[in-house]
Regions:
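Internal, hydrophobic cores of structured domains that mediate oligomerization or house catalytic pockets
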Residues: 98-184
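Terminal interaction module
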Residues: 2, 26-39, 46-47, 51, ...
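Charge-rich, low-complexity segments
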Residues: 1-119, 125-135
């Protein structure tokens, strides 16, 4: 004899935000899903730190700049900032400065101002020690936060673990079994104070395989 089951489903969607990493880890740990929170991306944090150095010292006042990754390895990542000068046949990209995150033997990281062109960025040259300290501060602050994209990745992982699937023609809307809502709602309650809106609603199912990804 076939057993009865509740065929109702729930729809889920959310608006993500940049939040403290500790808040995300606490929320997902509450439902034993802390491994879904992506680890800090040292390279992207370094790119954002470089952008803050550019803003703090007016490096872009003389024209647009672009960050580029330096070849690195497991224990070091680096970013260089170059001036972007559009040309008729090719663009010119003169070097301005570079910073790196270097892993120490104790597992911690040290942020260094690796190189700079004193003629191109005299404000960096005059205050290179201050710039290095700022880069270290900016980088650590960035690592302590989870980006909106990373939070979306974590929430998506949670919904998938709860048996959810994406409804293609409803935008970024997911369907999940109603009996799996507890974990979603618990994470939603813990993240709400940080400006994250996780919304869910119950609706009867309507099967259409073209909507399922």
């Amino acid at each position: 004899m076939a057993q009865k089951f509740d065929s109702d489903s729930a729809i889920a969607f959310w608006s993500s935000a940049r939040i403290p990493r500790s808040a995300a880890e606490k929320a997902f740990a509450a439902v034993d899903k802390e491994t879904l929170v992506p680890r800090a991306d040292h390279f992207n944090a370094l790119k954002r730190a470089a952008a803050q150095i550019v803003a703090a010292h007016g490096v872009a006042d003389d024209g647009p700049v672009k960050p580029y990754g330096l070849s690195g390895h497991a224990n070091a990542v680096g970013v260089e900032v170059r001036r972007f000068i559009r040309g008729t046949t090719r663009n010119d990209l003169p070097f301005l400065f570079s910073i790196g995150a270097l892993r120490q033997t104790d597992g911690s990281y040290r942020i260094e101002l690796l190189e700079y062109d004193a003629a191109a960025v005299p404000q960096i040259a005059r205050a290179h020690r201050k710039v290095e300290a700022q880069a270290d501060q900016f980088w650590r602050q960035e690592c302590e936060y989870l980006t909106a994209n990373d939070l979306t990745q974590a929430i998506t992982g949670l919904v998938k673990d709860c048996g959810g699937f994406l409804l293609r023609d409803e935008g970024v809307v997911w369907s999940m079994p109603i009996h799996m809502l507890d974990a979603y709602e618990k994470v939603a309650d813990l993240l709400a104070p940080h400006g994250v809106q996780m919304i869910c609603g119950i609706c009867p199912p309507k099967v259409n395989r073209r909507l399922i990804q």
